[in-house]
């Protein structure tokens, strides 16, 4: 297995698909890496030479923020918003949608599973 940016990439994957296993590199950036380093997209990871893998590692380290650095930067950005006590920070703190989505009848993913209201008992119907 090729190890790039601390991630084991499966041997049988195509190069541009295998690079997307790295957090922070999607289809667009993997294609950009392949074209700039002149590595064919149809090539598989196990067909790459050690020199090619080294070139990919150096290119990613020089041009992208990936894996732990990107995750840390993302969490620090959210922490900064919360510390500023701005609207976006307060929405993050309350675990509600941040970008203006409605919450009255949706936002189940962000708010979590629906919770029944405790303490209310149904009264039996009178005849």
Swiss-Prot record:
Any GO MF annotation of the entry: rRNA binding
Gene Ontology biological-process entries: translation
Classification via InterPro entries: Rbsml_uS13_C, Ribosomal_uS13, Ribosomal_uS13-like_H2TH, Ribosomal_uS13_bac-type, Ribosomal_uS13_CS
Keyword Ribonucleoprotein found: yes
Transmembrane segments: none
Record-linked PROSITE patterns: RIBOSOMAL_S13_1 (PS00646), RIBOSOMAL_S13_2 (PS50159)
Alphabetized UniProt keyword annotations: Ribonucleoprotein, Ribosomal protein, RNA-binding, rRNA-binding, tRNA-binding
GO cellular component, one term: cytosol
Domain of life: Bacteria
SUPFAM superfamilies (alphabetical): S13-like H2TH domain
Function text: Located at the top of the head of the 30S subunit, it contacts several helices of the 16S rRNA. In the 70S ribosome it contacts the 23S rRNA (bridge B1a) and protein L5 of the 50S subunit (bridge B1b), connecting the 2 subunits; these bridges are implicated in subunit movement. Contacts the tRNAs in the A and P-sites.
Family: Belongs to the universal ribosomal protein uS13 family.
Subunit structure: Part of the 30S ribosomal subunit. Forms a loose heterodimer with protein S19. Forms two bridges to the 50S subunit in the 70S ribosome.
PANTHER family reported for this sequence: 30S RIBOSOMAL PROTEIN S13/40S RIBOSOMAL PROTEIN S18 (PTHR10871), SMALL RIBOSOMAL SUBUNIT PROTEIN US13M (PTHR10871:SF1)
Protein's UniProt name: Small ribosomal subunit protein uS13
Organism of derivation: Pelagibacter ubique (strain HTCC1062)
Phylogenetic placement of the source organism: Bacteria, Pseudomonadati, Pseudomonadota, Alphaproteobacteria, Candidatus Pelagibacterales
